[in-house]
Amino acid sequence: MDRSPLFLIIMGAPGSGKGTQSKLLASQLSLLHISSGDLLRDAVSKDTPLSQEIKSYLDQGKLLPDTLVWKLVHEKLDEFQQDTLLRRLSFLSRSENSAILDGFPRTVTQAKLLHEFLSSYFPNYKVILLDISDEEVLNRLTSRYICPACQGIYNEQQGFSSCPKCSVELIRRSDDTLEVILDRIQTYKQETQPVLDYYTEKQKLITIDANAPTQQVFQSILDSLSASLVYQERDCCNCDCDDED
C-alpha cells in the first residue's frame, strides 16, 4: 500500500467494530489512533479552560455544541499536524505521520469543519463506513462483555468469564439492553445519514460490509484502501495540474 501520509475517518453503528478495526488499522498501517471519546475523557480529567467549558455542559446534562467538540478534536489534530510537519522536515519515515479518527464527526457541521482542516493537510483523506445490519448489531451488543480495566471487548461465544489479558472479571454494559440498543440504532441512523450524504457528495466514502468476521472485515478495508489510493494516484498522474500554460 502507498506509504504517503494517510488520514482515515471511521464510522459505523454501535457494535459495528469501529474501535477494533481502528486498532488493527493503526497497527498495520502505522497510524495514530485518535478517539474522540478518549479525548473527551482526557479533557474532563484535566483542569483547563476547555475542560471546564465541557464540564459545564455535561454537569447540566446538555449535549456539547458542535463548535466545542470541534475545538477539542481540532486541538489534537493541530498538535498531530505540527508533529507531522516536523517529521517530514526531518526526513523521517511515515510512522504516525498518518492517523485514523474514530467517533467524529457526528453532524454535518462537524464534518464541514473537519473537511476544511483536512483539505489543507490531507486532501486525499478517506471515510470508512462499517455497514452493518440491525440484526447483527443486536446480536453483537446483547452478547458482548467488556473488561473494566483495559476496555477489551469479548462475546459470549468466546466463553471468557475474565479478561485473558488482565484477569479481571468481565462485565456487561448497563446500556446493552434491547430497548436501549434499538434506540441507539435509530438515533445513529437519524444523525449519521446526513453526514454520509455529505461524504458521498465529496467522493470520500468507502463502504465496507461489517457483518463479516473481524479479520475478513479488516482485509476488506485494506483491499478497498489499496484500490482507492491506486486509483487516485493514476487519476492525478493523468491530470494536467502540473502542466504549464
Curated annotation (Swiss-Prot):
Residues 35-64 are annotated as: NMP. The keyword Transferase applies. Pathway: Purine metabolism; AMP biosynthesis via salvage pathway; AMP from ADP: step 1/1. Zn(2+) binds at residues 147, 150, 163, 166. Disulfide bonds: none annotated. It comes from the Bacteria. Keywords: ATP-binding, Cytoplasm, Kinase, Metal-binding, Nucleotide biosynthesis, Nucleotide-binding, Transferase, Zinc. Its EC number is 2.7.4.3. ATP binds at residues 15-20, 144, 153-154, 212. Consists of three domains, a large central CORE domain and two small peripheral domains, NMPbind and LID, which undergo movements during catalysis. The LID domain closes over the site of phosphoryl transfer upon ATP binding. Assembling and dissambling the active center during each catalytic cycle provides an effective means to prevent ATP hydrolysis. Some bacteria have evolved a zinc-coordinating structure that stabilizes the LID domain. This is Adenylate kinase.
